[in-house]
A protein has these predicted regions:
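Short, surface-exposed secondary-structure edge patches
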Residues: 60, 75-79
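A short, N-terminal "cap"/entry segment at the start of jelly-roll beta-barrel domains
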Residues: 1-41
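Conserved short histidine dyad/triad with adjacent acidic residue
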Residues: 36-56, 80, 89-92
Length: 109
């Protein structure tokens, strides 16, 4: 990721309109800001959320609240709790997420 031509700024995530995205189960609420080619999101997964697709996009993901389980295409499963993060490159390792109890995440991609 290369960040160019971005002046100092702040974001009040409570003021960013949320969009709702249905999963195979449950839903995800995204609050999204774009800064050039960089997408920054505050995500909220409902309890019982399960992604409806495998994702090949690279991310930096930080779990703020709740618990997130990420399954990789090779069968590995990673569980994040608050304060834990993961990072993955574009087109590197397909992954999909679920959350039994719900989760709040901060994602940069």
């Amino acid at each position: 990721m290369k960040i160019d031509d971005l002046p100092f700024g702040t974001v009040d995530w409570n003021q960013v309109e949320a969009t709702t995205h249905a999963g195979a189960r449950g839903e995800a609420r995204w609050r999204t800001r774009l800064f050039g080619d960089v997408r920054v999101r505050m995500l909220e997964y409902s309890a019982g959320y399960e992604a409806d697709h495998w994702c090949s996009k690279g991310h930096f993901l930080l779990c703020l609240d709740g618990e997130l389980e990420t399954e990789l295409a090779d069968g590995r499963r990673i569980t994040l709790q608050p304060g834990m993060s993961y990072q993955v490159a574009d087109c590197a390792e397909p992954h999909r997420s679920r959350s039994r109890s719900g989760a709040r995440l901060f994602v940069v991609d």
